[in-house]
Amino acid sequence: MLMPKKVKHRKVQRGRMKGKATRGNSIAYGDYAIQATECAWITNNQIESARIAINRYIRRGGKLWIKIFPDKPVTEKPAETRMGSGKGSPEYWVAVVKPGRILFELSGVPEETAREAMRLASHKLPIKTKFVTKRDFEEVGGESDEG
């Protein structure tokens, strides 16, 4: 499972998810990727399920990069416990994902294979996603340089 080896603070506040992703919103390594279109917490189990779905579909070919990491602990109190008496214990880890964030990148496979693999992975995730290619970002980058 994905989780940090060591953390400065064992418990953190929930925080707010507002705005768009300012970092990690372009393809860095692969040719194809899935991009988040809404915000959510994605757990380490969901990331692992999506990774397995992609790897099973592409089999031996291609290389996969996971661009998100669950570094936020989520605490839960035991069932049937009265309110108060402190914050619960950390139960699982989540990655905070904002719209525009690249979740997975893939290369070394045909576009149709990548599209289907990413579709299978997106069914394992709790958010809406869209399939993007490196060409999409090059076109956008080319237009902004000229204008």
From Swiss-Prot:
Q: Which GO terms describe its biological process?
A: translation
What InterPro entries does the record point to? Answer: Ribosomal_uL16, Ribosomal_uL16_bact-type, Ribosomal_uL16_CS, Ribosomal_uL16_dom, Ribosomal_uL16_sf
Q: Could you tell me the keywords of this UniProt record? A: Ribonucleoprotein, Ribosomal protein, RNA-binding, rRNA-binding, tRNA-binding
Query: GO terms for CC?
Result: cytosolic large ribosomal subunit
Q: Decide whether keyword Ribosomal protein is in the record.
A: yes
- Family membership: Belongs to the universal ribosomal protein uL16 family.
Q: Which HAMAP family match?
A: Ribosomal_uL16 (MF_01342)
Report what the protein is called: Large ribosomal subunit protein uL16
